[in-house]
Amino acid sequence: MTHVLVLSRNYPNSVFPSLGLWAERLVQAAAPVADCTVVAPVPWAPPLLRLRSAQRFRAVPAAERGVGGVPVIHPRVMALPGTRLHGLDARMQFPSVRAVAEQVHRERPVDLIHAHFIYPEGVMAARLGRRWQVPVVTSEHALWLPWLDQWPAVRRQVVLAAPNIARVLAVSRAVQDTIHAILGPEAHTGLLPNAVDEQVFRAPAPGEHRDTNQILFVGAVRHVKGLDVLVRALAALAHERPALRVLVLGEAFYGQWRRDEDAVKRLCHEVGVADRVIFEGRATPERVAAAMRSSAALVVPGRRESFSAVAIEALASGTPVVATRCGGPEDFLSEVTGTLVPPEDPAALAAGIRSVLDRGEPFDPAALHRIAVTGFGMGVTTSRVEMLYREILAGGGRR
């Protein structure tokens, strides 16, 4: 069976179990057609550094087995705090990644490298692929613009690496458009959306309770995710829906994310909805799925979203989605599955929530589940991955 080296900083581990679940699901989907070894770098934390984040990074094991017994290796890499030296990430991390990858390749030759994100993973993967003479593909989970316009040093590395990448895969058309804006119309790109595990995210069973006064937000509380916009929308709905509340499921991994979360909590007090926004913190996929089935709607209020895996998970759970037109959700959301509204507009978001909650003809949970599984289930994703790997290994897709 094809041996694939998966390179991704974002991958679940025993300390951060919800980190990069979308990468893990693609590995699960690939399991019937490929043997994957995952290299998931972790920031090196000096022994005397007592920050909570440093202690957690140190607790990540050097190697472990992921879902399905997939070997996951965690080399320690140099990672400076903040983004000031972002352009040096690939250079600083490559020695540690190369050492581990070379050992994997010696023990069993790698046939293909699949990196998640073009930088730094894709840039490092391109160097390994050139060294081993094996093809490289990258999955792109972020919009390249305005990011690469803001980081010219990173942009140069991406453009230089691109000729050594057989296929640059986007999770949505919005991401694909930004890739072509950087690499040109001739770039070999493709679409490989995120997958949903329909065994976890199932439609509600007959008689399963749904709380019509609960709407759900799932994800890290980062400014770009727009929870502040949802809080203002909730305040706008307060007089007509005094019982409506928001359940927030998600963990702030990093310092800036925690500061963003604190800012949202202050906003909740300022606009008078602190008692109706419940921050539950980290949640397992099973807890998220249960909350989706029991909520009236999932709200995705993002300023920018490359895909929105949680929206697909909600549909698979039989729950409609209110989302902003922020990039990825436009590929699969419509009036059949919920509604789309402009970003950064609390009044429009409130109107969208109102329209979904007040819909005359209720959404059919079984129909929403079918839509999600048909387009993004594990079975269809396995077929996509198999076709992709077969084509790449046959020599297709070179720029």
Question: What are the residue ranges of the model-derived segments?
Answer:
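A conserved mid-protein helix/loop that constitutes part of the nucleotide-sugar donor-binding site
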Residues: 21, 123, 217-236, 259-262, ...
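Carbohydrate-associated surface elements
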Residues: 174, 195
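Short alpha-helical donor nucleotide-sugar binding micro-motif in glycosyltransferases
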Residues: 282, 290-295
